């Protein structure tokens, strides 16, 4: 995936071509000079134009490695728009103008020579003019470096080169006069053959000698350049204060960045956002400023850090590039004008879901088994747990087992081991023949492999070093990774970042069946280069652990710079090692990049350890407080004022002596105290009235300055807002208008309400707001409290009724391996401890029947069930379900039993046997439900609705014809029972009002019900329906295990065929049934729907906290 953005450029100019043209021109001369110094053929081919250029335009000796090297550096600097290169070229051109003018003024030149001088003068004047006009385009500076040290190396190198060259000329002088040999050597070594050879008497020395003299100068220049470039990196590397600031940012914001800790690698440089809350670490290679990973720090400050980094790139003429950015980081760089391309994927393991079981982990499982059989055990320690001697041994192993001369890595490697600042790093060792068994016990075995992982936030680890001895058994690495995941909980690790797999998608796509020729060719190339760079090996070593793949991106400014950024990345990561690169050298910079105010605060440490976090939070992480409504801000200010005065706004509670309702009925001379929420306040100066509500009711408080023992009513007004919780103590009495009131002597605040209550008269009028803020609805709305009481009364009445009949209440599992007991779509979840998919139960039926088999003759469960179905006024995904089973009974027994349960519940909630039903005007009116209820068969009820007689023997074509006539849809694969059930639901259930029992359902739609004892084709089952809502169902339970198995197998076939509501085959339940269950009548009742009809409200209104769609 590639994210592109418009390229960032400075203001365009008519002379923008000058830097590139100057660089190319000088570069061509440098290239030709180098080739001519090596090849006599090329030197002969370009002799004539070279001599013209050398005489009149630009110094171009026949052989000079030194001059070629100088010009190469100058060409690169000009192309990079370095200001110092502009000055050098300008001064050279100005000097050349002077030389040409001087030669013309002497007047002793031939006509041809004068023409050459004029051409050269014109070229130099034009070059000076264009360079002056293009001066603003050469803005780039040069980084600080050890300039004097480099100059000393250059001087010493040149001196040695001149002396060696002088000696060489003494040995092979040709016809060169002795007096000129030293000067000739100096001209060739450090004057770049700038003096005309004709100035020296005698014939020139052999061309090989000239080439060697130029090579001596080139070597001196190279040595000086190497010293300068290396000093630039070391001078500008991280200082202790920089590293300390980075560690502080990582502690504050680094919990999501698996590569964040690698920002402390000490051969990197750093640039901070101006506010110090974010930073970017980078390294400069081949003119590319290569940032490693995401910015470190507050994501809100990433744009400022990126802007500072890009400004730095512009200052020094570097091309910006990024290696290993995450999706969020790539988006941030893209917003700053860079483009991004997916580089590969990082392998993330989650130990809580890591298992060696399963076919996908077979290879790892077998490798682990082999390693264990070889006697390998794993030891895991923090670096701080190792003694200096033990750490020295670890470092020795890491160096000895490294398969390259230098350590690789840049964006995903730390580059050091054993530093005291890295004490939180993890060390995982594979030990062969170890006798110790503890995690941190050094044991007595031989270490054969090791992993070192750096911290990833507070609960993660990111792989830094992986080493194994050539003598380690096969499977050692797999064993270490597996044991790390298995023991992760003990060491506080919840996520592990393994190696980075570059071009992972290319390997996968190229290996797929039907991959195109381009994909296969690209994969072949990657496999070919993997012989040296281990691309495929890293991919396969990660893939076998079944990790989560997290994409990482490379960012660049312009598509033309992709090859250059790629080369810089290859050099930085260590795949291409340049001479004298000193990758293993630890740097400590000399110029702190952290903001000066942060350095001056004193929180940073010189040794690079994490800073004082309290000071760092104050200085760098002071986020703006969230914007709050005005009333909330006022209340917050009042809370702070109270706390400043020593008032505890949230004290420890103490039970009040009376409820509000009891206080109203108490005698006047009894001192009492009440507690509740203030709903209204009326202030009349020295007298104040407040309405206090608790769960029992309301009481009016009367505060009078003359009766208050301490403080005044003004103190109450200043401290208390509507909604606050208070305690008040006093005696009962009457106000002047005769209202029964608590005459308050003293009071205290027990809970400050920081958000205003809704309108004191209307309350919460929006139904959605009432659902989402039920706590507020309960605080201000007596109707909401009545519904809570009614629901509690219904549950209590159901339990009491069953208890009095001798039923035993039990609890069965909510998490179930097989969904059964009803035809419904289940919720699926997963248990990490057993790596097992589970269902939230749709019904407790199958477990309750197991209890019946065990001899529990009267049993019930009143609890929660879950069905992943629609939500409406009568359906909720999570609901309360009653299931009860009575041995030696049938479904007829439960007709009276169910009616009694509901009537008792109605009595508990409403005080009489009534349902509340809304009239046309919305007012609820009671509907009597006392006495017996109507009982009908399903076929009789459908016949009444159709006007045509049907029964269990009616054939399918006839039923379809009747359904078509009634406009009832059906599916072609349905049998007779399913068609009858569909007509029943549309024509009977939806139109039923008074509570009615519909019995004897078709057998095919009742898989857990026994067949009717006398009527073929129907089952002993009834449904209770009232006002279009199914309230309950009861069965004469199927106890025949053979028939039960046949029906459940049919259901399992439907489930295998894609029916999400069909029950799965529960073999354990079937085995239980084979031990024989007594004849049993079972009842299932939806308690939420019963409460709904008793109270006249929807299910959402009767539930304290119904499921609400996210805002």
Curated annotation (Swiss-Prot):
Chain segments annotated as transmembrane: 18-38, 60-80, 84-104, 118-138, 152-172, 209-229, 308-328
Function: Catalyzes the production of L-lysyl-tRNA(Lys)transfer and the transfer of a lysyl group from L-lysyl-tRNA(Lys) to membrane-bound phosphatidylglycerol (PG), which produces lysylphosphatidylglycerol (LPG), one of the components of the bacterial membrane with a positive net charge. LPG synthesis contributes to the resistance to cationic antimicrobial peptides (CAMPs) and likely protects M.tuberculosis against the CAMPs produced by competiting microorganisms (bacteriocins).
Catalytic reactions on record: tRNA(Lys) + L-lysine + ATP = L-lysyl-tRNA(Lys) + AMP + diphosphate; L-lysyl-tRNA(Lys) + a 1,2-diacyl-sn-glycero-3-phospho-(1'-sn-glycerol) = a 1,2-diacyl-sn-glycero-3-phospho-1'-(3'-O-L-lysyl)-sn-glycerol + tRNA(Lys)
Family: In the N-terminal section; belongs to the LPG synthetase family. In the C-terminal section; belongs to the class-II aminoacyl-tRNA synthetase family.
Protein name: Lysylphosphatidylglycerol biosynthesis bifunctional protein LysX
Start and end residues of each stretch annotated as Phosphatidylglycerol lysyltransferase: 1-612
Cofactor comment text: Binds 3 Mg(2+) ions per subunit.
Major location (coarse): membrane
Superkingdom as given in the UniProt entry: Bacteria
BP-aspect Gene Ontology terms: lipid metabolic process; lysyl-tRNA aminoacylation; response to antibiotic
Entry EC no(s): 6.1.1.6, 2.3.2.3
Species of provenance: Mycobacterium sp. (strain JLS)
Residues binding Mg(2+) 2, per UniProt: 1030
DNA-binding feature ranges: 674-747
Gene that this polypeptide is encoded by: lysX
């Amino acid at each position: 995936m590639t994210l592109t953005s418009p390229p960032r450029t400075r203001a365009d100019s008519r002379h923008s071509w000058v830097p590139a043209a100057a660089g190319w021109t000088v570069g061509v001369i440098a290239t030709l000079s180098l080739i001519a110094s090596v090849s006599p053929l090329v030197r002969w081919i370009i002799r004539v134009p070279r001599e013209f250029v050398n005489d009149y335009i630009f110094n171009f000796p026949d052989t000079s490695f030194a001059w070629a090297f100088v010009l190469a550096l100058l060409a690169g600097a000009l192309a990079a728009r370095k200001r110092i290169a502009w000055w050098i070229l300008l001064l050279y051109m100005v000097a050349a103008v002077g030389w040409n003018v001087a030669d013309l003024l002497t007047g002793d030149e031939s006509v041809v020579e004068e023409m050459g001088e004029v051409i050269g003068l014109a070229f130099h004047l034009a070059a000076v003019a264009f360079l002056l006009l293009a001066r603003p385009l050469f803005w780039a500076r040069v980084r600080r470096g050890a300039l004097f040290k480099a100059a000393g190396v250059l001087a010493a190198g040149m001196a040695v080169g001149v002396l060696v060259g002088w000696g060489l000329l003494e040995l092979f002088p040709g016809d060169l006069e002795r007096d000129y040999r030293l000067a000739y050597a100096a001209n060739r070594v450090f004057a770049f053959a700038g003096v005309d050879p004709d100035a020296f008497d005698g014939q020139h020395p052999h061309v090989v000698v000239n080439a060697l003299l130029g090579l001596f100068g080139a070597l001196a220049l190279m040595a000086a350049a190497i010293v300068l470039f290396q000093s630039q990196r070391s001078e500008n590397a991280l200082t202790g204060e920089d590293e300390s600031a980075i560690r502080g940012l990582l502690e504050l914001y680094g919990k999501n960045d698996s590569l964040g800790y690698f920002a402390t690698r000490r051969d990197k440089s750093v640039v901070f956002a101006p506010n110090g809350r974010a930073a970017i670490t980078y390294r400069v290679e081949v003119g590319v400023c290569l940032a490693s990973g995401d910015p470190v720090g507050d994501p809100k400050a990433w744009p400022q850090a990126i802007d500072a980094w890009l400004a730095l790139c512009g200052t020094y003429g570097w091309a910006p590039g990024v290696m290993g950015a995450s999706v969020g980081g790539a988006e941030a760089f893209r917003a700053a004008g860079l483009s991004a391309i997916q580089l590969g994927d990082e392998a993330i393991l989650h130990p809580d879901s890591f298992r060696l079981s399963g076919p996908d982990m077979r290879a790892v499982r077998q490798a682990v088994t082999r390693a264990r059989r070889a006697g390998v055990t794993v030891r895991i320690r923090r670096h701080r747990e190792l003694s200096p001697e033990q750490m020295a041994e670890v470092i020795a192993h890491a160096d000895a087992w490294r398969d390259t001369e230098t350590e690789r890595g840049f964006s995903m490697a730390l580059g050091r081991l054993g530093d005291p600042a890295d004490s939180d790093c993890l060390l995982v060792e594979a030990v062969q023949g170890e006798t110790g068994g503890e995690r941190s016990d050094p044991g007595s075995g031989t270490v054969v492999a090791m992993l070192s992982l750096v911290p990833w936030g507070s609960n993660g680890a990111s792989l830094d070093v992986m080493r194994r001895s050539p003598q380690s058994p096969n499977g050692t690495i797999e064993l270490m990774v597996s044991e790390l995941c298995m023991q992760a909980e003990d060491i506080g690790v919840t996520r592990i970042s393994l190696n980075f797999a570059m071009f992972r998608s290319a390997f996968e796509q190229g290996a797929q069946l039907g991959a195109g020729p381009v994909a296969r060719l690209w994969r072949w190339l990657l496999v070919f280069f993997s012989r040296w760079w281990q691309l495929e090996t890293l991919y396969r070593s990660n893939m076998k652990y079944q990790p989560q793949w997290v994409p990482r991106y490379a960012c660049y400014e312009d598509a033309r710079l992709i090859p250059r950024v790629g080369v810089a990345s290859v050099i930085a990561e260590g795949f291409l090692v340049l001479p004298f690169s000193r990758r293993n050298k630890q740097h400590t910079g000399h110029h702190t990049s952290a903001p000066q105010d942060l350095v001056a605060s004193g929180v940073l440490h010189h040794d690079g350890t994490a800073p004082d976090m309290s000071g760092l939070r104050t200085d760098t992480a002071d986020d703006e407080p969230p914007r709050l409504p005005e009333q909330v801000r006022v209340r917050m200010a009042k809370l702070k004022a109270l706390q400043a005065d020593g008032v505890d706004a949230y004290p420890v509670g103490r039970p009040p002596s009376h409820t509000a309702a009891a206080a109203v009925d108490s005698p006047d001379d009894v001192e009492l105290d009440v507690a509740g929420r203030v709903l209204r306040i009326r202030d009349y100066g020295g007298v104040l009235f407040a309405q206090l509500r608790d769960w029992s009711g309301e009481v009016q408080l009367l505060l009078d300055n003359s009766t208050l023992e301490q403080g005044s009513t003004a103190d109450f007004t200043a401290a208390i807002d509507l909604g606050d919780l208070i305690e008040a103590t006093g005696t009962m009495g009457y106000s002047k208008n005769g209202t029964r009131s608590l005459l308050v002597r003293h009071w205290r605040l027990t809970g400050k309400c920081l958000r205003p209550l809704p309108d004191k008269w209307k309350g919460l009028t929006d139904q959605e707001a009432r659902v989402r803020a039920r706590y507020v609805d309960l605080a201000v709305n007596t109707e909401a409290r009545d519904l809570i009481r009614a629901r509690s009364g219904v549950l209590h009445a159901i339990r009491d009724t069953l208890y009095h009949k001798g039923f035993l209440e039990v609890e069965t599992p909510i998490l179930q391996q097989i969904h059964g007991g009803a035809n419904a779509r289940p919720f699926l979840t997963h248990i990490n401890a057993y790596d097992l998919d589970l269902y939230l139960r749709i019904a407790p039926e199958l477990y309750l029947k197991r209890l019946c088999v065990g001899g529990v003759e009267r049993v019930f469960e009143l609890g929660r069930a879950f069905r992943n179905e629609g939500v409406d006024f009568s359906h909720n995904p999570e609901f309360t379900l009653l299931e009860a089973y009575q041995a030696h009974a049938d479904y007829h027994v439960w007709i009276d039993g169910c009616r009694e349960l509901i009537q008792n519940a109605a009595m508990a909630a409403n005080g009489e046997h009534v349902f509340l039903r809304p009239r046309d005007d919305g007012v609820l009116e009671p509907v009597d439900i006392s006495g017996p209820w109507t009982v009908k068969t399903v076929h009789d009820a459908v016949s009444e609705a159709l006007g045509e007689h049907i029964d269990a023997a009616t054939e399918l074509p006839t039923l379809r014809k009747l359904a078509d006539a009634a406009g009832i849809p059906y599916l072609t694969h349905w049998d007779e029972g399913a068609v009858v059930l569909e007509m029943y639901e549309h024509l009977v259930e939806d139109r039923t009002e008074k509570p009615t029992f519909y019995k004897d359902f078709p057998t095919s739609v009742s898989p857990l019900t026994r067949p009717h004892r006398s009527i073929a084709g129907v089952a002993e089952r009834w449904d209770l329906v009232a006002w279009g809502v199914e309230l309950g169902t009861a069965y004469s339970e199927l106890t025949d295990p053979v028939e039960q198995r046949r029906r459940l197998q049919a259901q399992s076939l439907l489930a295998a065929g894609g029916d999400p509501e069909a029950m799965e085959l529960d073999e354990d339940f079937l085995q239980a049934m084979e031990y024989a269950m007594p004849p049993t009548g079972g009842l299932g009742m939806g308690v939420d729907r019963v409460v709904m009809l008793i109270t006249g409200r929807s299910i959402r209104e009767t539930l304290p906290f119904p499921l609400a769609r996210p805002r």
